[in-house]
Amino acid sequence: MDPINQRIGDMLARIRATRPLIHHITNLVVMNDTANVTLHVGGLPVMAHDAEEVAEMVAHAGALVLNVGTLSPDWIESMLIAGRRANELQTPVVLDPVGAGATQLRTRTNLELLRSLRIAVVRGNGGEIGALSGEGGEVKGVESVSGPEDPLTAARRLAQTYHTVVALTGARDIITDGERVLTVNNGHIWLTTLTGTGCMATTMVAAFAAVERDYLLAAAGGLAMFGLAAELAAEKAHGPASFKVALFDQIYNLTPEQVANGARVVEGGS
Amino acid sequence: MDPINQRIGDMLARIRATRPLIHHITNLVVMNDTANVTLHVGGLPVMAHDAEEVAEMVAHAGALVLNVGTLSPDWIESMLIAGRRANELQTPVVLDPVGAGATQLRTRTNLELLRSLRIAVVRGNGGEIGALSGEGGEVKGVESVSGPEDPLTAARRLAQTYHTVVALTGARDIITDGERVLTVNNGHIWLTTLTGTGCMATTMVAAFAAVERDYLLAAAGGLAMFGLAAELAAEKAHGPASFKVALFDQIYNLTPEQVANGARVVEGGS
Amino acid sequence: MDPINQRIGDMLARIRATRPLIHHITNLVVMNDTANVTLHVGGLPVMAHDAEEVAEMVAHAGALVLNVGTLSPDWIESMLIAGRRANELQTPVVLDPVGAGATQLRTRTNLELLRSLRIAVVRGNGGEIGALSGEGGEVKGVESVSGPEDPLTAARRLAQTYHTVVALTGARDIITDGERVLTVNNGHIWLTTLTGTGCMATTMVAAFAAVERDYLLAAAGGLAMFGLAAELAAEKAHGPASFKVALFDQIYNLTPEQVANGARVVEGGS
């Protein structure tokens, strides 16, 4: 077995064994879904956003998710407080820049988070990563209408600028720390028919980052498992909602062995 | 084929072809569901409520949904900002007056929105439309306990007062611009067993209004398709939750031809 | 038939006959789920949190749920306003102390609610009840990592201190008013794989409390029915999400007779 696959399977086993708390400060649309995804992959979810408690809460967490999908000023403040505390504790922070590029508020806020915090992984679609990297792309609401012309270059530039790992998800997922590149070929077109699948992918990345300090590999692991679950779920789908039920069931049912066998991760961005 | 049916099928085809952005400022209970309904019918959803970004966001939208289901003052302010910008751009605004009649805050806020903005369509249940029209009816929480004695008169009066289209949904849906009247006979009793089906219907209306300037017909189209999906979903339901899965699958799977064939829309309010 | 079972079946029949409004001031994660559970058991849900309307809304309610899962200061203020009005009207208030013990804000807020209001039932997991009673236990995020050494003593102490009924849910549910004790043996391990099942249980308790002034028995009834629905749903589950669909369907489909027959409630805490 490819050593990457073996390591991805091992990460899932560690999530299931240690049940890391994944603290989310996330948007109002996906809270229920991402809490369930956290539980199904093996972690413990908590959604807490008040400035008074986020620093205390994140101190118990294995990873922190910052997701700006339904932004408001007081939540941004809480994200900064929680993020700084996570940085002090070396707890990985995973950023989902939902809708970056769609409005100035979203673009500016994401750049502020990237500048103010040490972000372990940024997980976004082509339009969002394009907007943040300055390499172009278009976002309509929260959907990527078009990505940057060269996604890998955009991801690499963003990763280098902010010393982070960038995971640009789409038909194929590109992950880079600015030098190394991994490509994840798992996934299914049904994922585009549901709201919040990007946010769910981010939660998967956070769960893996909670148990693996090589964040490039952690991101690949989370995305490969999510994509694999989607592939298997598609066999039972009659539409987006039955696909979602099957997807969540699969995330719960997949074993470390199945994930190690089914992950399709390759080195390089070709 | 009835020309109305043909036009309804054509509208769905246009939604699928143009994927209009449907900007929602909506309640916390239904955000996920209405985002998914938007995607399944063929549009792109975005939920954005911060005063700083709503005017910018709505400028890219094909329609704006204002839904007061879980009201708070800062969201009302955002609704007014987004609504005014939508009015400037001639983008249709669809209002869902959730719980109008249940509390003074809800009744007053909905009337303020109706007075301050040019609303394309108001979609509410009998109790809500009754309360806003002054024709009576009772709302308990967000449910219509009893509608106005004469629903058509209530709908007509509200439509005339605010120069809008009123869609009063129930066992049969009545839609009027104050003069013309359409009745939609699609639907299923299972819809009453789920939370948020009124809000979902509003989202359907908004998606159709994004591609059709005859808002009376657009409202009929959205409601007919929603009701038709419910009829087909009921065949697979073992209870409300399996009904919901089937309903969402159906909204996604229905083709323009099926909707044109299955819509049961008649002129007049008899 | 055991008289307790008969009374539980009768309560469900009363819920279905009178459709009490269950006013929730609850967390952002579970709003949709608990609204649906309210409808499926037979009540009418409303989620309303603005300080300006909560007193008016709760005046029409059969029960008030206060759930602190995603806390912020303005919501706490609304909880106090609604709770005081409910107390004046003798409307039962059911508290779900989500995450008590996890942060100081959560522990302090729950104790403040317990001191300021007359709470009919507190429904929490072992860690939460342990933290509030001072009897120990550990909460990680919102999950009970470990309960108090002697759950019954913790529940009893909390009940006595605040003159309330405490329902400590887990593999077996312990319910006490400080003197009398009931144990509910219904339930299923699948409930631990889904987010918000504690909150759903609280909603069930509130629906039963809306029609039964013996809150000890009402809590047992709500929890027994919820657990029974879970047992039946487990037969159709392929994972947590299909379990959830089946659970919600079952809550809707269960008849008073089935609940009277299937409830496994015993007196005492052994």
UniProtKB/Swiss-Prot annotation, chains A, B, C:
A Gene Ontology biological process term: thiamine diphosphate biosynthetic process
The reaction(s) this protein catalyses: 5-(2-hydroxyethyl)-4-methylthiazole + ATP = 4-methyl-5-(2-phosphooxyethyl)-thiazole + ADP + H(+)
Keyword Thylakoid: no
Domain of life: Bacteria
Residues reported to bind ATP: R123, T169
InterPro entries attached to this UniProt entry: Hyethyz_kinase, Ribokinase-like
EC code(s) of this entry: 2.7.1.50
Keywords noted in UniProt: ATP-binding, Kinase, Magnesium, Metal-binding, Nucleotide-binding, Thiamine biosynthesis, Transferase
NCBIfam families in UniProt: PRK09355.1, thiM
Name the UniProt record assigns to this protein: Hydroxyethylthiazole kinase
